[in-house]
Amino acid sequence: IIHSHNYLMSFFLLKKTDIFTVHDGLYYQSGAVNHKLQNLFKYIEKKVYKKSGLVHFISKFAKEKSLYRGDNFKIIYNTTPFEKIDLKYSSKVNWETDKIKIFTVRSIEERANIDLLIELAKRKRNYDIKVAGKGPLLEKYREEIRKNQLENIELLGYIPDEEVRKFYETADLVTVLAKYGEGFGLPIIEGYLYNKPVFASDICAIPEIIIDKNFLVKNNAEDLESKIEKYYEELPVYNFKKYYEENFSYDRILEKYRQMYDKFFKI
């Protein structure tokens, strides 16, 4: 079986792609940034679907924003390998112990809305914000943090999985912010795996994945701050880990993949 996640690879592949997985529609993504080759990407996306035996989407949102109009598709959410991989922690993570500890994992690019976290750090000095991930805007944002003399937010850059897991375990909450192009929101379920509240932007596939609409935020620092403060004032009872296990656990998602492959073999 040829199972591809890459539009260009499948487009240039001489053989037919048996199963093609869509994270974000190519045409939708290019439109979000007004790419000059948007019409070419539209052609490529449609061509790839025609060459694919079965199309798999990681969310309903990904399906809605795609150019796929056929009936031979499956929607299966993501899971996280952190559930099954037993890693040893080689180092400690440094938090300000008297502050609310906020962790996020993002690619440091325009759509990740790092500006919002920097603004939050300016407003709330009692928050300790750690951002893991690399990307083209990493140094730009680090310089902005230095210029504003913000000691309560740190861009960690790339860190190994064992450190990512340790940050998840020791954080008080997780944020997942986005301006566009969020076909699923993997850090949301990673936060739930470690039984953490996750506050995330009210866009794209995120409302599908979030445990409750009370954790959805508008893309401004005021609303994010308000939602976090309200949570700590009321301390509502949620079992985030159970929500993960019932909807995104490795075994549940693996079974759905098995069913998808069974469907393919029956075509």
Regions found by a protein language model. Give the residues of each.
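Membrane-proximal helix-turn-helix segments that form the acceptor-binding/catalytic region
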Residues: K36-V55, Y68
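A charged, aromatic-enriched C-terminal amphipathic alpha-helix characteristic of glycosyltransferases
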Residues: E233-K266
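Short His-centered aromatic/hydrophobic patch
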Residues: S4-M9
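Short alpha-helical donor nucleotide-sugar binding micro-motif in glycosyltransferases
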Residues: Y158-I159, K166-A171, Y257
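Short hydrophobic beta-strand element within catalytic cores of glycosyltransferases
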Residues: I188, P197-A200
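Conserved donor-binding/catalytic core segment of Leloir-type glycosyltransferases
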Residues: H56, N94-A112, I118-K122, I129-K130
